[in-house]
């Protein structure tokens, strides 16, 4: 592939010049874009020869001014990888009227069917010239498997921006990508979220860890160096997304049979634990004052993973003050079940007025995602290394189980590392198996 040039589009069997769009160039500055020899201006990055990450493609204005063109993306994939050899994995959970539909994909694919001769001619030229992307990792040792042929162009498996997916979904997606790619060395998986950073990065890193045996640190580095220009970003950085990658790291150290066992037991576990106690360790003087209130929300995804459901709200003015200065809340006995994957959010407000609280809430905001089942396993395995230690019935203990997360390990505003005003030194969460 050559250096970036002017953008071209297929028309009347060949190519037509059109001006380069400045907005696309500005918005994709941090990305290390793969150049192509047919003049298409696309924000795409090859992580492997058969694994692409890109930003969100669109087919309507005004977003066509600064996003990937869906037409251009499909044309690129058809020319460089061949008709029927690619599948798009869409990780966006948020919905907008301008989102591309399945019918849009089908229509674009059909349009290029009518230009098949010209596309195949162009593809043959590129192959003969050796202008096919090269992967930094050798894939020759991959074992191919047979699969029934299907014409699915896109799989929509999304969740909300800046968050990790439910852990079971993370494993399902990674395995789904491998199942698709393992059918043929000609196939390519195209991953996108909004910017091709956090959600796509998580899945890419998890895939490299599981199927190319890369350590977590190395997998993060491969993604960062392949997707971004030097010094622009560290790639996947949101603490909860990294926590779920560490869960994944823990999970894949088990043999395949144990992995299946853990997945099966996780379904049972969500009805077998009770959130018992929450403690703010060394709270700041700010939240121990009479006027300031910290609102804690305990949430999980809805079924479509495009919104959060709030299961419990706790206000700091009803928390107990312990001798050491810590603040605690003990959950009622009726509060028994949560999803394994839950989110805890902390916002600062005031008891003086709603308007003031709304303004103050922007001065401090922090949150975290946890998978309670995996947190339990990572605690239990220190004392119980039996082959079936992960079974729910073996997890019961007389004492509470728990985890402590420092303020710095919480998520901040969106993808930013900043949390605003520090509310406490650390969060301690405790639960019991019932």
Swiss-Prot record:
Alphabetized, the UniProt keywords read: Hydrolase
EC supergroup of this enzyme: hydrolase
Q: Which GO terms describe its molecular function?
A: phosphatidylinositol-3,4,5-trisphosphate 3-phosphatase activity; protein tyrosine phosphatase activity
Query: What InterPro entries does this protein map onto?
Result: Dual-sp_phosphatase_cat-dom, Dual-spec_lipid-protein_phosph, Prot-tyrosine_phosphatase-like, Tensin_phosphatase, Tyr_Pase_AS, Tyr_Pase_dom
**Which Enzyme Commission number(s) are on file for it?**
3.1.3.67
Active-site residues from the entry: 193 (phosphocysteine intermediate)
Listed transmembrane segments:
none
Looking at the record's lineage, which domain of life comes first?
A: Eukaryota
Phosphatase tensin-type domain mapped to chain residues: 33-255
Pfam families annotated for this entry?
A: DSPc (PF00782)
GO biological process, alphabetically ordered:
ascospore wall assembly; phosphatidylinositol 3-kinase/protein kinase B signal transduction; phosphatidylinositol dephosphorylation; regulation of phosphatidylinositol 3-kinase/protein kinase B signal transduction
Q: Which reaction does it catalyse?
A: a 1,2-diacyl-sn-glycero-3-phospho-(1D-myo-inositol-3,4,5-trisphosphate) + H2O = a 1,2-diacyl-sn-glycero-3-phospho-(1D-myo-inositol-4,5-bisphosphate) + phosphate
Give the GO cellular component terms, alphabetically.
cell projection; cytoplasm; cytosol; nucleus; plasma membrane
Function recorded in the entry? May act as a phosphoinositide 3-phosphatase by regulating PtdIns(3,4,5)P3 levels.
Tell me the protein's name: Probable phosphatidylinositol 3,4,5-trisphosphate 3-phosphatase TEP1
Organism of origin is Saccharomyces cerevisiae (strain ATCC 204508 / S288c)
Phylogenetic lineage? Eukaryota, Fungi, Dikarya, Ascomycota, Saccharomycotina
Gene field: TEP1
